[in-house]
Swiss-Prot record:
Its EC number is 4.2.1.109. Signal peptide: none annotated. It catalyses: 5-(methylsulfanyl)-D-ribulose 1-phosphate = 5-methylsulfanyl-2,3-dioxopentyl phosphate + H2O. This is Methylthioribulose-1-phosphate dehydratase. It comes from the Eukaryota. Keywords: Amino-acid biosynthesis, Cytoplasm, Lyase, Metal-binding, Methionine biosynthesis, Zinc. Its cofactor is Zn(2+). It holds the Pfam family Aldolase_II. It comes from Komagataella phaffii (strain GS115 / ATCC 20864) (Yeast). It is found in: Cytoplasm. The keyword Amino-acid biosynthesis applies.
């Protein structure tokens, strides 16, 4: 007669499988796994994450949710998500058929060095083009949209007449090899909420996913504006 009881190891495996799914399946539209899918579609429609490029991660307490590598952003579903414990950097959930995002160590840098709540990586054409025109930093001032960007080192946002400074780091053959340069830029520019990568794109983070989204949109607007100003011979930093 066959037994109706499972071994302890089998029970553990079943419980683990269920708990892994519970990490990403929710009817709550604000759940990180659902938000990542929603935002990936928005970024795809904006032309920022074509051809599976780019990435996004959202932090919820000690857990971080990360969009996978190799999945078309407009087709992303919650079941595609990786989930990691921030402190141990161990995966709590790994989709069997997908690869972790190569952006993960850079996301971790934003979480641990800036206590970010979310980090966005896009391949925005404006971001790429600006890095071909500027050397070590991108600078712009006296544009109203600058007021959407935080001061970071003190309370409040930048003012109209303030100068926005975003460091530019050199690209590498592999995404994860950008980690040291990004960390160095974060240390050297404590007031920045973004880092540009030459001929590649941009990383933007914020206290919450919504703030990161606002910063990303505002910065991309400013980058596009800077390109048009350059074409017309207008300095991006207003001269007194």
């Amino acid at each position: 007669m066959s037994s109706c009881f499972c071994s302890k190891s089998q029970e553990t495996e079943k419980r683990g499988a269920v708990s892994e799914d519970q990490l990403v399946i929710s009817d709550d539209s604000t759940h990180p796994a659902n938000l990542i899918c929603e935002l990936c579609k928005v970024f795809y429609n904006n032309g920022w994450v074509t051809g599976t490029g780019g990435g996004i991660s959202i932090r919820e307490g000690s857990k971080i949710y990360i969009a996978p590598s190799g999945v078309q952003k407009e087709r992303m579903v919650p079941d595609n998500m990786f989930v990691m414990d921030l402190e141990s950097e161990n995966y709590l959930r790994t989709p069997l058929t997908l690869k972790p995002s190569a952006c993960t160590p850079l996301f971790l840098s934003a979480y641990k060095m800036r206590d970010a709540g979310a980090c966005i990586h896009t391949h925005s054409q404006a971001a790429v083009m600006v890095t071909l025109l500027y050397d070590k930093v991108f600078e712009i001032s006296s544009i109203e949209q600058i007021k959407a960007i935080p001061k970071v080192t003190e309370k409040g946002n930048l003012m109209y007449s303030d100068r926005l400074v975003i460091p530019i780091i050199e690209n590498t053959e592999r995404e994860e090899d950008l980690t040291d340069s990004l960390q160095q830029a974060i240390e050297e520019y404590p007031g920045t909420t973004a880092v540009l990568v030459r001929r590649h794109g941009i990383y933007v983070w914020g206290e919450t996913v919504w703030k990161a989204k606002v910063y990303n949109e505002a910065i991309d607007y400013l980058l596009e504006l800077a390109l048009k100003m350059h074409q017309l011979g207008i300095p991006t930093v207003k001269q007194n």
